[in-house]
Curated annotation (Swiss-Prot):
Protein keywords: Cytoplasm, Hydrolase, Nuclease, Ribosome biogenesis
GO molecular function: nuclease activity
Function, as annotated: Could be a nuclease involved in processing of the 5'-end of pre-16S rRNA.
Record protein name field: Putative pre-16S rRNA nuclease
Signal peptide: none
InterPro entries assigned to the protein according to its UniProt record, in alphabetical order: RNaseH-like_sf (IPR012337), YqgF (IPR005227), YqgF/RNaseH-like_dom (IPR006641), YqgF/RNaseH-like_dom_sf (IPR037027)
GO process annotations (BP): rRNA 5'-end processing
Disulfide bonds listed in the record: none
EC code: 3.1.-.-
Subcellular location field: Cytoplasm
Top EC category: hydrolase
Length: 143
């Protein structure tokens, strides 16, 4: 593979960002970008810097589905964000089911002894790591 993939956990106020290693085996946290989706501030200026730095071949966005698998308004917003991202940067965009990733991320932080105040700073980028790692695991090269 030898190319990185960015993972994004897109919310209404923040975008958690993660990146894969060059082999596409592991995901690492990068940062959390503050956005204001209602005002149309999608964090693309900061993403442009990260895309230039990491040179990903693809971006994976979390797709928030209902527990029964249906897609609702948040999934529609995620797909809209992905379309805008693809149009702006010319990158392939893929989607990964993100059900329970925020809950998983919170559990990891709690189990790690991270204080509530500090969890808020890390939860979105950790959710982005889980989204990207789930994608990498599902699309791993079979050796």
């Amino acid at each position: 593979m030898f190319a990185r993939i960015l993972g994004l956990d897109v919310g209404t106020k923040t975008v958690g960002v993660s990146v894969s290693d060059l082999l596409g085996m592991t995901a690492q946290p990068v940062e959390t970008i503050k956005i204001d989706s209602e005002a149309g501030e999608l964090g693309f200026d900061r993403l442009a810097v990260l895309i230039k730095e990491y040179k990903p071949e693809k971006v994976v966005l979390g797709l928030p589905k209902h527990m029964n698998g249906d897609e609702g308004i948040r999934a529609e917003a995620s797909r809209d964000y992905g379309t805008k991202l693809a149009n702006k940067f010319g990158l392939e965009v893929a989607y990964q089911d993100e059900r329970l990733t925020t809950a998983q991320a919170e559990k990891v932080l709690i189990d790690g002894g991270v204080r509530r105040k500090d969890r808020k700073k890390s939860i979105d980028k950790l959710a982005a790591v889980l989204i990207l790692q789930n994608y990498l695991d599902a699309h791993a090269l079979k050796l």
